[in-house]
């Protein structure tokens, strides 16, 4: 009996009447009344006071000052958010009509409760039962408060009470809090009624009616959409599918995804079937919030600051879940005591213990699911933050002169594992190779984001360890500290393993960078590789780097084996030491009740030990990847927004000296002073290597300005510019010497974000000599150009890049030798009709060229460069008279092109050349046919058996897999024998003897014999289990080596047609993220699956052996488990496939941004490309988000089924005992 003064809390097997009246009926309802009333009053008063005032959550405006803000305007997500919202369709997921009708039912139930209380209160005899009267009065006032609350919720739709909307969610929270609290309080009185402790008929009817009305109200609110929350969705079109409005029940049990899972069960899912993300999970909202909460500095503190609310929530949920997970262990000694002696406790009390086990496990499972889902949602958000920051950095990063190496250099040195340190070190310090940036995004960003899942597991592990040790101390006394010290002694071993694992991981990532960089270079140069038959050379170089990766993977497998061995053998060692101290030094009797309760705690301890080991390992990998991301984000950025000065009258240089950032050569542009003529054609000539391209890049602000000034018409973002009356904007367009095209159609590449005007488009196509080519293509302007223009000839690529600059609304054009890849006749036509034609009216054009006679023919201003210096400049006619070298160069060019003079009519041009390419270029029949735009597809339905057999064949066949699985059954049988041995030891009664413990003889054996055998069984089991894992990983590593070699060979030796229609980003996704999954997740996950299946089968067999009646429950539970798993497998399979497909466009965007960053920045089009990346990220996040929700959906249900197994087996055991 538990007492509190004169009022006992508990009487034998039930709550006392005094406690029920004082606490259940009075004090707790009074607390609910006061807290609910104060909270509701404050929220309603605030809403009423602030009525009519406009409060928004808009981001604070920033002051524009200094040149640095031009960069902020281009890259700030806060600036981008408003533009995004204005262009997107905002849909609100409103409450259904049935949900609104439920509120009237809710009000009717509240009125019914008030009526019942008034009736009982009026008919109650006035006596000295103070708490009885007070309790009814308090509860009546509480129901009056809830009636007021439901009334306010009902009238919130009225225009006269619109201010109530501001606190509608708070009012709903008060109702839910009250219903849930009252129903919880009514459970114990209802139990008292069922076991016959309450005899009064009126009270019995009252308690039953109150409980079921409270339950009805709670169910009404739990299954209705949450009020006061607008779930808005920013989508590209109004037909995008939206998820159902969330309910409390749906959020807690993840039932919100039921419809999607059922749809996936009936037919295959596509991108159109995936629900959109609500606005709070959109990348634009995530980044805007992150930007507002972040400060300049390292990434880690900003991440912690942004996710602090998530961390605090996970900390609380982990605490609750960890404590409740031990409730079955705390109740187990009492249940076992009843099993040993049914007369020691009443059936009612033991049934309460079993029910408490069920309830505690359900609540613990719910808390754990919510904590893990918070981590998974945080993973998605952190991944969004990292990928977006890396992409934004790519658009801001300084370009390097040596960023693009020659193919010969790549073939000879790119894959060397130990390059000369004298050459490698400066490069390492200056910048990461462009081709390895994709690796930072695809591997490092994902590894860092996965660390969000580990925080909850780490907190849970710490809480579970502390709680288990506390319970062990209460059970075993100070001998539990002996086990604790043994546990602490293992921590240095874990950290030692983690340190080595981290070092190997860092080395592996370096080799992965080299591998992906080499593959990217090979894909970008695949035409030349096939032309020179270098496939075998590149294959061997990449395989050599891959072999280094495989060696490191095997070293990591060895460390994993040691860590696994510590994890498995730890509980055995700890339990052996604890039991030894308990028996020998404390001189206590080790009974089966104590032993198996302690063993259950040690078994629970194994989970946090595993979590700590895996968490440390994952955190080390994450910190290594985070450092790599931080190093990339710390790389030097372009200073163009600082060095360029805006001027409406000047366009050029004033005594400017410039150099390349981190250049390997000492080349500089020295003392450049040029004032380009506005609304004119300006030409720059000079010998090869004189600095013409560097000069144009300097004008764009891409070089490092050492001294002087650079004047440009604008430094503002493209979206912020105003269109003039002539349709032009005061901006620049750039056409590089090497044409840069995006994967898309010809129209996409030419229009490039501008408003499409068919007449203007046709004029540009004609002036750039593209109209004949387009007519020859089946799809016309909708023809896909392939990855980076791969399907087009060099001349076509350059003319499309030129057409993009001409079609743009920019008033200033910067063209870098844009006619070098076309034949002389086409070059002359483009020069006359395009660069000197009506398309250039009112525009300023700066062009560099080696064709001196062509560009000087009609140029208004000529600049001659030599060795980085301006030798002369002026009108071409004046320079020709005064410069003999220029005069001779023009005469030589004129002699060479005399026989190519043509009539400027288009008919003659098309007869002499194909595609406008120089003689010997790719023919139109070869490269200009319509290129189909193949979208990445996915398999449908279940994974075919042939796929499993294909993987099994790499292992050595299905026989090897069968032997491996069978060994798991045998090994776990050995593990279970340890428990049987302990039971046999205890049944011998050896611990009850008074003789010397170590040499006590029972049935011819001493206690040391039993103890050593117990330890040996645990050690053998641990070695076999860990060895099986090690063999599996080593074998899997050899398998991944073969798979990679097969994949690489297929790609390198594929026909050009395949490369024409397959974007590089899609291929890189296979070699980066997919290969990383195969390397590090496939085999461990398979081994974990086989282990779990074996353990599950053994548990069912053992429970069935001990309690055969359990099999009656096992059959429906197994059927339920099969149904749940079948539903999940189909949904998860489809979602994983879609998720994997939707990542490829992100890879493609990165590849395009790396190649075309100069063009993008010149066009001031960074904001549009960032928007495209955010759309791609959202497209990838949607299936990832719902895949995680589906994972928690099945995890929750499987845990509930496991809880039902525990509950049903416990019921069978106590029924058998009674």
From Swiss-Prot:
GO MF term list: ABC-type transporter activity; ATP binding; ATP hydrolysis activity; ATPase-coupled transmembrane transporter activity
Biased composition (Basic and acidic residues): 424-434
GO cellular component assignments: fungal-type vacuole membrane
Any single Pfam family the record assigns to this protein: ABC_tran
Top-level division of the source organism's lineage: Eukaryota
UniProt: ATP binding residues: 686-693
Ranges of the Cytoplasmic topological domain: 51-103, 152-169, 223-302, 375-449, 505-558, 606-953, 1035-1082, 1133-1197
Domain ABC transmembrane type-1 residues, every copy: 311-621, 961-1218
Occurrences of domain ABC transporter (ranges): 651-892
Region of interest: Disordered: 410-434, 892-926
Signal peptide residues on this chain, from the entry's feature table: none
Membrane topology note: Multi-pass membrane protein
Sugar-modified residues: 4
TM segment ranges: 30-50, 104-124, 131-151, 170-190, 202-222, 303-323, 352-374, 450-470, 482-504, 559-579, 585-605, 954-974, 1014-1034, 1083-1105, 1110-1132, 1198-1218
Gene Ontology BP term (one): macroautophagy
Subcellular location field: Membrane
Biased composition range(s): Polar residues: 892-901
Parts of the chain on the Extracellular side: 1-29, 125-130, 191-201, 324-351, 471-481, 580-584, 975-1013, 1106-1109
Entry similarity comment: Belongs to the ABC transporter superfamily. ABCC family. Conjugate transporter (TC 3.A.1.208) subfamily.
Designated name of the protein: ABC transporter NFT1
Record lineage: Eukaryota, Fungi, Dikarya, Ascomycota, Saccharomycotina
